[in-house]
Swiss-Prot record:
Keywords: Initiation factor, Protein biosynthesis
NCBIfam families tied to this protein: eIF-6 (TIGR00323), PRK04046.1-4 (NF003128)
Protein's job: Binds to the 50S ribosomal subunit and prevents its association with the 30S ribosomal subunit to form the 70S initiation complex.
Source organism: Natronomonas pharaonis (strain ATCC 35678 / DSM 2160 / CIP 103997 / JCM 8858 / NBRC 14720 / NCIMB 2260 / Gabara) (Halobacterium pharaonis)
Keyword Oxidoreductase tagged: no
MF-aspect GO terms: ribosome binding; translation initiation factor activity
Protein name: Translation initiation factor 6
Biological process per Gene Ontology, one example term: cytosolic ribosome assembly
Pfam family, one: eIF-6
Family (UniProt): Belongs to the eIF-6 family.
Amino acid sequence: MLRAALSGSSYVGVFATATDEYLLVRPDIEESLQSEFETELDVTAVPTTIAGSGTVGSLAVGNENGLLVTERVTDRERDRLETETGLPVVELPGNINAAGNVVLANNEGAFVHPDLSRDALSAIEEALSVPVERGRIADVQTVGTAAVVTDDGVLSHPKTTDEKLDFLEELFGVYADIGTINYGGPLVGSGLVANNTGYIAGEETTGPELGRIEDALGFIQ
């Protein structure tokens, strides 16, 4: 467990995203903090921009099969991401293209913004090689901000219904529960970076919130 801030913000999920193979993080992260992130998640960090922005957690999402990024990514950024991760990088087309905000995915499934086009769904399937379903979480369309998923669990918006939790468990093949981040924040995807090894929560996250995170994501057996 690590509590941290990036560029003075507790919303670490806006600025970073992780799988069990890599961590993408904004390029101005301090070396000491980068080392702490790498140790907690047991991965190598790739400091980068996407579309010239440090909000890489909002603009990218991936799993063991590939990486999905906004179509505004530059050729140089895309080439570097492919080189550093060793994975294919696919662009999310259309006006709704902040991939990390609108796609929630692990190695079993993807749950995405309800208004994504068929072309966008095809791009997601191509990048991540998993079944894709559209919908909302607690009436939030940007599902990547409303939840966090690993191959061990889902932590979701506190107003997620039991029916939706059951749906998420079926889609992702893991246990799902509700929680908050950063002293009551409902958009847990914006304040949490996690993989199967560990997690980084916003520095304002409370002890009880950490307990919910650890239970939902399988760190407490």
